[in-house]
Swiss-Prot record:
<keyword id="KW-0342">GTP-binding</keyword>
<protein>
    <recommendedName>
        <fullName>Ribosome-releasing factor 2, mitochondrial</fullName>
    </recommendedName>
</protein>
<dbReference type="GO" id="GO:0003924">
    <property type="term" value="F:GTPase activity"/>
</dbReference>
<comment type="similarity">
    <text>Belongs to the TRAFAC class translation factor GTPase superfamily. Classic translation factor GTPase family. EF-G/EF-2 subfamily.</text>
</comment>
<keyword id="KW-0547">Nucleotide-binding</keyword>
<dbReference type="InterPro" id="IPR005225">
    <property type="entry name" value="Small_GTP-bd"/>
</dbReference>
<dbReference type="InterPro" id="IPR027417">
    <property type="entry name" value="P-loop_NTPase"/>
</dbReference>
<dbReference type="GO" id="GO:0005739">
    <property type="term" value="C:mitochondrion"/>
</dbReference>
<dbReference type="GO" id="GO:0032543">
    <property type="term" value="P:mitochondrial translation"/>
</dbReference>
<dbReference type="InterPro" id="IPR035647">
    <property type="entry name" value="EFG_III/V"/>
</dbReference>
<dbReference type="InterPro" id="IPR000795">
    <property type="entry name" value="T_Tr_GTP-bd_dom"/>
</dbReference>
<feature type="binding site">
    <location>
        <begin position="145"/>
        <end position="148"/>
    </location>
    <ligand>
        <name>GTP</name>
    </ligand>
</feature>
<dbReference type="InterPro" id="IPR031157">
    <property type="entry name" value="G_TR_CS"/>
</dbReference>
<dbReference type="Pfam" id="PF00009">
    <property type="entry name" value="GTP_EFTU"/>
</dbReference>
<dbReference type="InterPro" id="IPR053905">
    <property type="entry name" value="EF-G-like_DII"/>
</dbReference>
<dbReference type="InterPro" id="IPR035649">
    <property type="entry name" value="EFG_V"/>
</dbReference>
<dbReference type="InterPro" id="IPR041095">
    <property type="entry name" value="EFG_II"/>
</dbReference>
Length: 799
């Protein structure tokens, strides 16, 4: 019934049945308790013999010096442990700070399920909303943490989740309080298990002791609450599960309390996997309450690799599941496909490449083909990671998350690469190639664009090579950092997602990589774009080269993925929403039947390099790199059949692109600036002054003003009848809210949502603290690039 009991120290159990593997991540807003919860999971699973503490800087997953000194998660960490004896949980703890969004995006790419942690006092916060949207398609369970805090609101938070995320829920457990006779206050002591109809109370003096009480020991008020919750659970699940309806009417004789916990768990699992509902649990991880039921829920409700969504591929290849072998690409049980989602450099072990194996087995000593960059190498020393510690294994099987190490992988794999190997034969790539599967690629990770930059210069000319090597390591580990060079001044520019992001990069560059560099002041990453399509420019010579090039502006949402239609192929160029468009010719000898000496992929990659270098030269307003532009290569292009080098292609296309851009008048360019989504939480007595300051001094556009825990039934995701669904959902009374004096109108908080130029919001948190006596909070997320209006142009250019 319950997966927890006597805690025993356990090692890693290899080769677990696929159906008993859970690849999960923990996602939440910063300070919701992700790392604290992870530490308890490791302790109660027997993985560790002590509980680490964030404030003391001794947690397992936050092991970087910067993480321990700042008390925040900066990079995702992977660790494996067992639960319920035979289930293995591969857990990735992700950052909550907005500057490290890419770490979350990388992790979501390879996860099968998520645990969303909410702060019971703060409710559904900005970063939680963002990551919830990013994790669309991934089944989730929700854990409401910090139920011991004054002002915690379990039901308020559940209702907020339902409305903001347009999500149905079932209450798997609810908070259990007791009255403290000394203080006469309600104290959180455990949970009411709705599935098993039990009360679980944790001993405050012994972290390993849990008292489990049967239903006959409940007082009438608790029994009434639990009965209502059980009724609501059965009613909700019955909407999605006919088997439950049949069991309820026949076996349970229409009695909600007689419905079997086994049947309920099965029904919750089914509806969670289909994402019709999200199970809700609660606890206080810091007080060691509620973590074991959360682990039970991970095993009981979240998908195994056999039940997870299929990875998205670059081409139409059939994917299926075999109950014994796992995922099959093109019905080929011999092909092993893995995805590299993270690369880090360890000063002792060298380069570590984190991979998720989707099909087959990745074996030590086997040849591997990187279908993203065309490189081939042999696997040496695969390992399982336990935060910053490794465990050697001989292979990584389908569904597993592991790490490739050793000199054979160095420089051959980057984040987002697809790896292909033969599961049975060491050098079996030829047989995979014969079946046409060697070019299979899992769609890459979308890298968000940088919004801040700093100039980096070597302290002496002799330090330049060391600086470039250090920057290469930095960008390999974190592709959301971007290094570029000003062709006119030869200055090196490092760009990132935010002030903290670049501050951490600076620390690593100076302290970890020992780079002898000088670092300039923080600057905003402006871009330029063109407003009209250029005239075609043509090159043709007697040798056999012919290119017709046109450059056009792009409008609409930033997507940055390969697109292939019947008439043209689109290739993304870096992170600035630029594309290379190849028109498909009707002439034989091109495209799929290319028979030239120089490979077709080399031609494409060479022209991509031309585009990137040319766009980096910048526009005519401020010399900023180009954004949202497309280079179109007309379908009549020609390359000599006997050409073996790409140098001529590089020179020709680059000159054509530059010529095309130079032909445009300055008036055909526009300056782009980053716009931020801004969310400010402020006491309502300061609201007027804050709004006046935002609109008057920070060029903000106010989108909405809401109560902090207000419920907007009119959000774009809600359906017409969703208000009725939310209102009919049974939720227990929030008996602790009165302690927070939330009924005092003067203490109520408002949430101001706005859009504002990043330039106007730099260091705004200091201004907000001054306006609100230190009580205001601001959250910002990148919204997109927007053209600077003519009246603001001079102000922006002058800094």
């Amino acid at each position: 019934m319950f997966g927890f009991g006597i805690r025993q120290l356990r090692g890693y159990a290899s080769k677990t049945d696929l159906s008993k593997i859970r690849n999960i991540g923990i996602i939440a807003h910063i300070d919701a308790g992700k790392t604290t919860t992870t530490e308890r999971m490791l302790y109660y699973s027997g993985k560790t013999n002590r509980i680490g503490n964030v404030d003391q800087g001794d947690t397992v997953t936050d092991y970087l010096p910067q993480e321990r000194s700042r008390g925040i998660t900066i990079q995702s960490a992977a660790i494996s442990f067992n639960w319920q004896n035979d289930h293995r949980i591969n857990l990735i703890d992700t950052p909550g700070h907005v500057d490290f969004t890419f770490e979350v995006i990388k992790s979501l790419k390879v996860l099968d399920g998520c645990v969303t942690i909410l702060d019971a006092v703060a409710g559904v916060e900005a970063q939680t909303e963002k990551v919830w949207k990013q994790s669309y398609g991934i089944p989730k369970i929700c854990y409401i943490n910090k139920m011991d805090r004054v002002g915690s609101g379990y039901s308020r938070t559940v209702k907020e989740l339902m409305i903001k995320m347009n999500q149905r829920v079932v209450l798997a457990n609810m908070p259990l309080f007791k009255l403290d006779p000394v203080t006469n206050e309600q104290v959180f002591e455990g949970v009411l298990d709705v599935v098993n109809m039990k009360a679980l109370r944790w001993d405050s003096t012994d972290v390993n002791k849990v008292d489990i009480a049967d239903i006959d020991k409940f007082d009438s008020s608790l029994l009434d609450e639990l009965t209502k919750a059980r009724e609501a659970m059965v009613e909700t699940l019955s909407e999605f599960d006919e088997n439950l309806v049949e069991h309820f009417l026949e076996d349970a004789e229409g009695d909600y309390l007689k419905v079997s916990p086994t049947i309920l768990n099965s029904s919750i699992r089914k509806s969670t996997l289909s994402q019709d509902i999200t199970p809700i649990l609660c606890g206080s991880s810091f007080r060691n309450i509620g973590v074991q039921p959360l682990l039970d829920a991970v095993v009981n409700y979240l998908p195994s690799p056999l039940e997870a969504k299929f990875p998205e591929l670059n081409e139409d290849i059939p994917i299926s599941y075999d109950k014994r072998k796992g995922l099959l690409f093109d019905n080929n049980s011999e092909i092993c496909v893995a995805f590299a989602f993270k690369v880090i450099t360890d000063e002792i072990r060298g380069q570590l490449v984190f991979v998720r194996v989707y099909s087959g087995t990745l074996k030590n000593g086997h040849s591997v083909y990187n279908s993203t960059n065309g490189k081939t190498f042999k696997i040496n020393k695969p390992v399982i990671m336990h935060a910053n510690k490794t465990e050697d294994v001989q292979s990584l099987s389908a569904g597993e998350i592991g790490v490739l190490t050793g000199s054979t992988v160095f420089g051959r794999i980057e984040t987002g690469d697809t790896l292909i190997s033969h599961s049975m034969v060491k050098d079996g790539l030829k047989s995979i190639e014969r079946k046409g599967n060697l070019n299979l690629k899992i769609n890459p990770i979308i890298i968000p664009p940088p919004v801040f930059s700093v100039y980096i210069e070597p302290k002496t000319l002799g330090n330049r090579k060391a600086m470039e090597a250090a920057l290469k390591i930095l960008v390999t580990e974190d592709p959301s950092l971007h290094v570029s060079q000003d062709e006119e001044t030869s200055q090196t520019l490092l760009s990132g997602m935010g002030e903290l992001h670049l501050e951490i990069a600076r620390d690593k560059l100076l302290n970890d990589l020992k780079a002898e560099v000088g670092i300039g002041k923080l600057m905003i990453s402006y871009k330029e774009t063109i407003n009209s399509t250029t005239n075609p420019v043509i090159y043709q010579d007697d040798i056999g080269y012919k290119f017709t090039i046109q450059i056009e502006p792009l409008e609409g949402e930033e997507v940055r993925v390969d697109k292939d239609t019947a008439t043209e192929a689109w290739y993304p160029l870096g992170v600035d929403n630029n594309y290379l468009i190849f028109e498909k010719s009707n002439k034989p000898g091109l495209g799929a039947v290319w028979k030239h000496q120089i490979p077709y992929d080399v031609v494409i990659n060479t022209i991509k390099s031309s585009c990137l270098a040319s766009f980096q030269r910048g526009g005519k307003i401020g010399g900023y790199a180009l954004h949202s532009c497309a280079v179109r290569i007309k379908g009549d292009f020609e390359v000599p059949y006997d050409a073996t080098s790409s140098n001529e292609i590089l020179n020709i296309t680059r000159k054509l692109i530059i010529k095309s851009l130079q032909a445009l008048h300055e008036s055909s360019y526009s300056l782009l600036e980053p716009i931020m989504d801004v969310e400010i939480v402020v006491n309502q007595k300061f609201m007027g002054e804050v709004i006046q300051d935002l609109t008057g001094h920070h060029k903000a556009n106010i989108l909405s003003i809401e109560d902090e825990h207000g419920l907007d039934y009119n959000n774009e995701r809600s359906t017409l009848n969703f208000k009725d669904i939310v209102d009919s959902q049974y939720l227990p009374p929030d008996i602790t809210l009165n302690l927070a004096k939330l009924d005092n109108g003067g203490d109520r908080c408002k949430v101001i949502k706005a859009e504002a130029p990043l330039k106007e919001m730099v260091s705004y948190s200091n201004k907000l603290r001054s306006l609100t006596e230190g009580r205001g909070m601001v959250y910002m997320n990148y919204h997109g690039m927007k053209k600077v209006t003519p009246e603001r142009l001079d102000d922006v250019l002058q800094g």
